[in-house]
């Protein structure tokens, strides 16, 4: 039993129904409906933003489902899911390759191993993307140190480049293992709030409907002059643009 001002953790994650934290060397998920807590995996934020934590799967950061029963992580450029209770792991995608992987959190100047996903409210579907950086130009940085310097390389498209980073939006259904690609051209690796698809540590501009049957998202032009609000039917992949806005300067 712990006092309110002496809790055994300094960080925690939460959503509308659960709170997740580490205590006693284990990860805990507490259901706020019945106030029951179960242990399973290390779920504390790894300090690089967002709601991801580190679980099994080779120590890769994971993102828990809203009901706390499953966690997804990246392995070899593909997205995997782990059962929190049993530890069983299964691949959700199989065709991811270097520079064309799933749920990739890599803007070049900023990157992490945490998957970029958004769970549906019913915990049965995942919105994510396959990020295409094949053929994109590279930037280099020499990391100086007392011993030999280390050369760091990352993808960095420059103004005027014809080959740039894009994302192909997909939805994965965990109930039957199917994946639906949204029927639209690839989106720019942008958001309405910054030059990265991740802003403030979370994947913004994407929202599920309460019944998990559709989702809304924003598409942003590379120059931040145009925005498109779109609705996707996740069973068919059909996408409808419901609002378009443009400005002479930038958003």
Task: Annotate each predicted stretch with a short phrase.
Residues 1-251:
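Beta-propeller folds
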């Amino acid at each position: 039993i712990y006092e309110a001002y002496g809790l055994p953790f300094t960080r925690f994650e939460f959503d509308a129904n659960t709170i997740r934290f580490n205590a006693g060397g284990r990860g805990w998920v507490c259901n706020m409906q019945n106030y029951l807590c179960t242990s399973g995996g290390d779920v504390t934020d790894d300090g690089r933003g967002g709601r991801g934590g580190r679980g099994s799967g080779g120590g890769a950061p994971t993102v828990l489902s809203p009901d706390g029963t499953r966690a997804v992580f990246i392995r070899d450029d593909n997205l995997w899911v782990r059962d929190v209770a049993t530890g069983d792991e299964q691949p959700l995608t199989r065709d991811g390759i270097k520079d064309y992987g799933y749920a990739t959190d890599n803007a070049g100047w900023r990157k992490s191993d945490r998957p970029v996903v958004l769970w549906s409210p019913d915990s049965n579907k995942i919105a994510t993307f396959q990020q295409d950086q094949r053929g994109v130009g590279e930037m280099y940085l020499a990391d100086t140190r007392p011993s030999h310097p280390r050369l760091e390389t990352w993808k960095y498209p420059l103004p005027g480049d014809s080959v740039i980073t894009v994302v192909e939006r997909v939805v994965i259904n965990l109930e039957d293992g199917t994946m639906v690609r949204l029927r639209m051209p690839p989106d720019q690796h942008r958001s309405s709030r910054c030059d990265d698809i991740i802003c403030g540590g979370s994947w913004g501009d994407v929202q599920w409907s309460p019944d998990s049957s559709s989702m809304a998202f924003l598409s942003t032009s590379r120059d931040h002059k145009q925005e498109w609000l779109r609705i996707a039917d996740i069973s068919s992949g059909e996408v409808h643009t419901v609002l378009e806005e443009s400005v002479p300067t930038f958003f």
